[in-house]
């Protein structure tokens, strides 16, 4: 699994808590609120789809009410997931339900666990990656939260305001609340053994057990659907017209030439009396296009993800880099619409290999070949390119991201 170099990879188990009855949301023929339809799909399906497509997720366990097996089966019947999804029955309280999910994961060999409310469908991979980075850097517990912005009042039993509470250092907790797996399992087991059943979230159990909890920035949209009006607003949000967010990213790269037997450009090997010098396979075209894709979502550059100082990338095929960038784009809601590469070289001739290069780009990016362009020009014997000392590439990627009217 590829990770940013600043963090250790995690193997995450996901506990989705879906055993509640949701009485405040009112009764419905669709069942509890996690099975209500928003944007044409049940709430719980939106939640699961976000986790299913997250690279670090290794096992998902959904904790459901014993009476909801048919509801869950109906809701999930169209789900196709490479990440295993299983269900277990929950208990009388959220705390008991979470413990049931944790016990299921005990023999699944996960390093960490993310515990999430099924009725919080509006989180994204940016938040998950933020949490994973803290966990990978050694935090035993990570809580996404938003600073409290409303003015807080304290009232007496008669409903009269008695004080204004300072908002300083106050946060509204969200999920997924995330932990080193064995640590939070042990804390939950100890809480159950001691008869404590009044914890309202998992971070509270961690605090009680003496586990330090690190706060990371949550997302404003990551709200819990509690009332009937929440579900109606969520449906409106997902059903609103989709507006395109078209972004263009540019990338540039250059590699020196040295004596050799050929160069690799756009994943195609071209016999030549020189080769490109570099830490990886030095595919200057794919390196430029990787940067262009990352630029469309502010995800840094190729050196951030694959530093040349890291020996694991020595001689690596640049296919790894471009497919990684394309995956990041898709995880962040992007659709790659076009990829254009311009090669600047005196030799070798690109024309005879252009269609093979376009086919490789189509394969790596998962888009139609008509959306892939490869062009070449000389530098009119000017500069380092003109002296056949190197090859340069300029790439442009067009990606459509989507956002919704509120």
Curated annotation (Swiss-Prot):
The keyword Phosphoprotein does not apply. 4-CDP-2-C-methyl-D-erythritol 2-phosphate binds at residues 253-255, 279-280, 301-303, 377-380, 384, 387. The record marks 167, 224 as: Positions MEP for the nucleophilic attack. Pathway: Isoprenoid biosynthesis; isopentenyl diphosphate biosynthesis via DXP pathway; isopentenyl diphosphate from 1-deoxy-D-xylulose 5-phosphate: step 2/6; Isoprenoid biosynthesis; isopentenyl diphosphate biosynthesis via DXP pathway; isopentenyl diphosphate from 1-deoxy-D-xylulose 5-phosphate: step 4/6. Its cofactor is a divalent metal cation. Pfam families: IspD, YgbB. It catalyses: 2-C-methyl-D-erythritol 4-phosphate + CTP + H(+) = 4-CDP-2-C-methyl-D-erythritol + diphosphate; 4-CDP-2-C-methyl-D-erythritol 2-phosphate = 2-C-methyl-D-erythritol 2,4-cyclic diphosphate + CMP. Residues 247-406 are annotated as: 2-C-methyl-D-erythritol 2,4-cyclodiphosphate synthase. PROSITE patterns: ISPD, ISPF. Gene3D superfamilies: 2-C-methyl-D-erythritol 2,4-cyclodiphosphate synthase, Spore Coat Polysaccharide Biosynthesis Protein SpsA, Chain A. A divalent metal cation binds at residues 253, 255, 287. The record marks 24, 33, 279, 378 as: Transition state stabilizer. It comes from the Bacteria. HAMAP family: IspD, IspDF, IspF. PANTHER family: 2-C-METHYL-D-ERYTHRITOL 2,4-CYCLODIPHOSPHATE SYNTHASE, CHLOROPLASTIC (PTHR43181:SF1). In the N-terminal section; belongs to the IspD/TarI cytidylyltransferase family. IspD subfamily. In the C-terminal section; belongs to the IspF family. This is Bifunctional enzyme IspD/IspF. It comes from Rhizobium etli (strain ATCC 51251 / DSM 11541 / JCM 21823 / NBRC 15573 / CFN 42). The gene is ispDF.
